[in-house]
Amino acid sequence: MIVTETIIRFENVTKQFDNDPPVLDNVSFEIEKGKFYTLLGPSGCGKTTILRLIAGFLEASEGQIYLGDKVINQIPANKRPVNTVFQDYALFPHLNVYENVAFGLRIKKLKKDAIDEKVKEALRFVNLKGYEKREISEMSGGQRQRVAIARAIVNEPEVILLDEPLSALDLKLRTEMQYELRDLQKRLGITFIFVTHDQEEALAMSDEIFVLNKGEIQQSGTPIDIYDEPINKFVADFIGESNIVNGKMIQDFEVEFVERRFECVDQGFRPNEVVEVVIRPEDLEITSAEKGQLQVTVDWMLFRGVHYEVGCIDTDGNEWLVHTTRKVRVGDKIGLAFEPEAIHVMRLGETEEEFDKRLDSYDEVQ
């Protein structure tokens, strides 16, 4: 049996500025020790506010924030065992790499030998051994980020907060740094809390994802859970690309949409309950019109390198997005085929607690 330890807990936390609507609205969640968490959502959803509340840069309007079993609402930022890597890295341009990393240790008045040992160890961890005397102005974007991370880990915090640290990097370097950050977190065993609006980053790096919108957590879970079983239309649309249509749950394992009935793997709905149906573009297979479960017309096509992105319209006017390696032409009449497992049925207005309970019932039946 795996024993988990909660390191951070929010209980009914609200953050409001003046008389504006709450930036965070009655948010509760737990962060387990030693995992990589991502706070994911669009601009203004509240993800950076959560980070700043944990760091101590903001104070909650309501609710309690715990570190372990201790309430930290009133503990100042410099007294919390937390370090932050900012979007712009916040390095000191007049200090070299060594002095940037050593800065926090000097504030703590550690002995010179201890500082030297810790700084060199931190730089080894981020693959910057031998860069101690390098000026910050001489470093690339990826190297500067490594310096910022070394400065964070040298203080041996219990939690490292990362506020969109990859956003300024080009695509190739960003992908490399995703791997490096994930590998570093595993080697250190420290809890990482990463903020991003990039869905691919979140899916690639995280043990757990919290999807936020309008100051509320819409869904939390593993990347696979959230991608395969989105709780609502916002999550389905925000995480990857989705085809979403209105439907009706006829009975367990049978759903109706586009005026046809299909076998599915969902259950626990009321007979004839109005629902929303999601099918991912990569789960649709292009066939001949006669063999397809849906008959559509190709409306447009884009080449994306590893696949074609094909936009189609069915006879009812619904738009369908398909990812395929098969080349078609605009105006072609084609069929779309899919397996029952590709259909995901979403209950309107379902809470995360209700959603989790329904998914648990699937496991019990299986």
UniProtKB/Swiss-Prot annotation:
Domain ABC transporter residues, every copy: 8-239
Positions bound to ATP: G41, P42, S43, G44, C45, G46, K47, T48
Membrane topology term: Peripheral membrane protein
PANTHER family found in the cross-reference section: SPERMIDINE/PUTRESCINE IMPORT ATP-BINDING PROTEIN POTA (PTHR42781), SPERMIDINE_PUTRESCINE IMPORT ATP-BINDING PROTEIN POTA (PTHR42781:SF4)
Highest taxon listed in the record's lineage: Bacteria
GO CC entries: ATP-binding cassette (ABC) transporter complex
Reactions accelerated catalytically: ATP + H2O + polyamine-[polyamine-binding protein]Side 1 = ADP + phosphate + polyamineSide 2 + [polyamine-binding protein]Side 1
EC number: 7.6.2.11
A Pfam family hit: ABC_tran
Gene Ontology molecular function, alphabetical: ABC-type putrescine transporter activity; ATP binding; ATP hydrolysis activity
Biological source species: Listeria monocytogenes serotype 4b (strain F2365)
SMART domains: AAA
Keyword annotations: ATP-binding, Cell membrane, Membrane, Nucleotide-binding, Translocase, Transport
Localisation: Cell membrane
Function: Part of the ABC transporter complex PotABCD involved in spermidine/putrescine import. Responsible for energy coupling to the transport system.
Protein name: Spermidine/putrescine import ATP-binding protein PotA
Subunit structure: The complex is composed of two ATP-binding proteins (PotA), two transmembrane proteins (PotB and PotC) and a solute-binding protein (PotD).
Entry's family note: Belongs to the ABC transporter superfamily. Spermidine/putrescine importer (TC 3.A.1.11.1) family.
Coiled coil spans: none
